[in-house]
A protein has these predicted regions:
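Extreme N-terminal tail/first-helix region
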Residues: 1-22, 156-158, 163
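A short, Trp-centered hydrophobic/proline-enriched beta-strand micro-motif
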Residues: 13-37, 74-76
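Residue-level marker for the onset of beta-strands and adjacent loop->beta junctions
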Residues: 21, 43, 72, 125-127
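Short, basic, glycine/proline-bearing loop/turn elements
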Residues: 25-29, 42-53
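Residue-level signal for tight coil/turn positions that link beta-strands
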Residues: 42, 51, 80, 133-135
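A short mixed-secondary-structure module that forms the rim of ligand-binding clefts
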Residues: 47-82
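Charged, gly/pro-rich active-site loop segments
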Residues: 84, 88-163
């Protein structure tokens, strides 16, 4: 097993296996700051992880979805697992869309304790956000071992990753 595969295995152990993960999700605000420069916006979301993608249920008119519609570049961070990553956000559409049936079933299971309270599936704006990781750094035991992963090219990055 190479280092990239080792890192993927650790990500699956930490975030996969049907876990409800609290992650910080950063997007770019639609309105620039006073100097006309982009402003980051961050919030905590519950996410399901599978095969280098985090999935979130949300509302199609939420700020995060509107921001991602204008700029798909996102970043995430977790604690205490110490994983930071960049990725591409994509609105997969209404949770009841037939193309989402398998994923919706998984999300309902993972988020069972609160899913129905937080989501109105009859509202066509109740949607699934996919965060497709592009690169990231998994920090094991406070800098004992760093896995700098390029998820697009499926390799490790020699010159550092995302901190």
């Amino acid at each position: 097993m190479n280092e990239y595969e080792e890192g993927l295995k650790l990500l699956e152990e930490k975030f996969g296996c049907g876990k409800d993960n609290a992650i910080s999700l950063a997007t770019i605000a639609r309105e620039p700051n006073a100097e006309g420069k982009p402003r980051p916006v961050v919030r905590t979301v519950d996410a399901y992880y599978e095969d280098t993608v985090f999935y979130v249920t949300t509302h199609g008119k939420s700020n995060k979805i509107q921001q991602i519609a204008e700029n798909q570049e996102v970043s995430i961070a977790t604690s205490p697992e110490m994983f930071t990553a960049s990725g591409i956000g994509e609105n997969l559409g209404w949770v009841l869309d037939p193309k989402n049936v398998e994923l919706r079933t998984k999300l309902r299971q993972v988020f069972a304790q609160w899913y129905d309270m937080a989501n109105n599936e009859k509202d066509e704006n109740c949607c699934i956000l996919a965060i497709r990781l592009t690169r990231g750094t998994l920090n094991i035991n406070h800098w004992e071992k760093l896995y700098h992963m390029d998820f697009v090219n499926k390799t490790t990055m020699e010159n550092g990753g995302v901190f």
